Amino acid sequence: MTGSYLPSILVPLVGIIFPGISMALLFIYIEEENIS
């Protein structure tokens, strides 16, 4: 029963969090490069 509604929560969550993390890391990398 738990497996049926788990993907519907997990897929949007991963779709939001993963780009968010990658954008944050990219932003930090660019900022670090500009400072130095």
Swiss-Prot record:
GO terms for cellular component: chloroplast thylakoid membrane; photosystem I. It holds the Pfam family PSI_8. Keywords: Chloroplast, Membrane, Photosynthesis, Photosystem I, Plastid, Thylakoid, Transmembrane, Transmembrane helix. It is a single-pass membrane protein. GO terms for biological process: photosynthesis. It is found in: Plastid, Chloroplast thylakoid membrane. The chain crosses the membrane at residues 7-29. Belongs to the PsaI family. May help in the organization of the PsaL subunit. This is Photosystem I reaction center subunit VIII. It comes from Gracilaria tenuistipitata var. liui (Red alga). The lineage of its organism: Eukaryota, Rhodophyta, Florideophyceae, Rhodymeniophycidae, Gracilariales.
